[in-house]
């Protein structure tokens, strides 16, 4: 796998969970001898929702909710076969979305 790169993109609602998963990936990749760049924090996406509390008249009574989506990017440079096998066997938390791209 000479001159290749694995880009791993992580998304989660909980920043502690995503940081823990990123550190597990970094430890696994370094243990197999690959070079890791990251984790690089990307901008947090904040979605806000405003809901009317009153069913009828009171327009002033509202509740606001938000969801924050945290993102991280990791690049694994010059991965070997051991690195790919170790990453495939890695068990990450259920609340983390993982996208892997081989370039």
Swiss-Prot record:
Name a GO molecular-function annotation. Answer: tRNA binding
Task: Report whether Ribosomal protein shows up as a keyword of the record.
Answer: yes
Cellular component annotations (GO), alphabetically ordered = ribonucleoprotein complex; ribosome
* Stored InterPro entries: Ribosomal_uS10 (IPR001848), Ribosomal_uS10_CS (IPR018268), Ribosomal_uS10_dom (IPR027486), Ribosomal_uS10_dom_sf (IPR036838)
User: What PROSITE patterns does the entry give?
Assistant: RIBOSOMAL_S10 (PS00361)
Enumerate the Pfam families for this protein: Ribosomal_S10
Keyword flag DNA repair: no
PANTHER family given in the database record:
30S RIBOSOMAL PROTEIN S10 FAMILY MEMBER
| NCBIfam families with a match to the protein in the record | PRK00596.1 (NF001861), rpsJ_bact (TIGR01049)
User: Subunit info?
Assistant: Part of the 30S ribosomal subunit.
Query: What is this protein identified as?
Result: Small ribosomal subunit protein uS10
Q: Which organism is it from?
A: Stenotrophomonas maltophilia (strain K279a)
């Amino acid at each position: 796998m000479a001159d290749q790169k694995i880009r791993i993109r992580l998304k989660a609602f909980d920043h502690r969970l995503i940081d823990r998963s990123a550190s597990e990936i970094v430890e696994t990749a370094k243990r197999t001898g690959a070079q890791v760049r990251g984790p690089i924090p990307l901008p947090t996406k904040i979605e806000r929702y405003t809901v009317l509390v009153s069913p009828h008249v009171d327009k002033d009574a509202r509740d606001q909710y938000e969801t924050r989506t945290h993102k991280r990017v990791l690049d694994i440079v010059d991965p070997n076969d051991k690195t790919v096998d170790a990453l495939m066997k890695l068990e990450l938390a259920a609340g983390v979305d993982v996208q892997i791209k081989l370039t």
